[in-house]
UniProtKB/Swiss-Prot annotation:
Pathway stated in the Swiss-Prot or TrEMBL entry: Purine metabolism; IMP biosynthesis via de novo pathway; 5-amino-1-(5-phospho-D-ribosyl)imidazole from N(2)-formyl-N(1)-(5-phospho-D-ribosyl)glycinamide: step 2/2
Reactions catalysed, as given in the entry: 2-formamido-N(1)-(5-O-phospho-beta-D-ribosyl)acetamidine + ATP = 5-amino-1-(5-phospho-beta-D-ribosyl)imidazole + ADP + phosphate + H(+)
One GO-annotated biological process of the protein: adenine biosynthetic process
Coiled-coil positions: none
Compartment(s): Cytoplasm
Residue spans crossing the bilayer: none
CDD domains referenced in this protein's UniProt entry, alphabetically: PurM (cd02196)
InterPro entries, sorted: PurM-like_C_dom, PurM-like_C_sf, PurM-like_N, PurM-like_N_sf, PurM_cligase
Protein name, entry field: Phosphoribosylformylglycinamidine cyclo-ligase
Similarity annotation: Belongs to the AIR synthase family.
Amino acid sequence: MLTYAQAGVDDEKTVRALKNIIGLARETFKFRRGKPGEPAENLGHYSALLDFGNFYLAMTTDGVGTKVLVAEAVGKFNTIGIDMIAMNVNDLLCVGAEPIALVDYLAVREPDEKIFAEIAKGLYAGAEKAGIAIVGGETAVMPDLINGFDLAGTAIGIVEKGKVITGEEMRPDDAVIGISSSGIHSNGLTLARKLLIPKYGLDYEYEGRKLWEWLLEPTRIYVRAVLELLERVEVHGLAHITGGGLINLKRLTNYGFSLEMPPIEGIFKLIHENGVPLEEMFRVFNMGVGFVAIVPPEEKEEALGILNKYYESFELGRVTKEPGIRVENYGIKL
């Protein structure tokens, strides 16, 4: 089991299966045409944008995926809420929106007061980091359907017209800046779990931490860093590096990227040492870079100064005229 597809997650198959849903969903845009909340047809690669006159309401939905299985296995539920909020608010940032509110969806086999209390702690911590309000939610108790629990949410943000980040402003030689991740975040857990847990067990010590600690490290929330960046620097593109790894950059532009990625360390090193090919690593995991900002070359130093106040950030490379993503220091083209 050396690829995500072999672990049971076939992204290409998912894209093919979604075509009918996406096509019919776009057909529903006409139901709001000429009314408040009309969807913006060609804007929004990470989040939908709804037109409210002088501003757009950005909207997105996401969950935690199989990271919840690790939480269940070790009985640690107080950070999983941070992950769910991070997955949503970081996506809102990518269109230039300020996250403002979220509703959560918790599906369980049976309610457990102690577990709910721990999940709530993570939701509160995530909301505080993101500066958002949790304004509602749904708890579904479904013993015939759910074995364990699932946690997801839908978040909204706002962005003024004229300030939407689409990637259209990107040009060759723009600087590509990476903001470091905290680890695996909330993507690639299916492959990591199925590869590592049967071989080592969750209590396996690796570089001073147990395997479950590596896997449950909360996803970083980049709201404060990116909002300050947007206030002070001209930004041409933003990308949350989630499922698909660096392939997420292709959402922004038809231009290409020439990158020098950080050394492979921590949980990524362990996964790679257990047989996952390098190209697959960069297609599945964030590889130490949780968020990317693309800025004009002359703005690079100021951008790095801002972002490094929050998390370690570094110049990854540049935008190129030639399409494709090249990881130069590992000899990989995606």
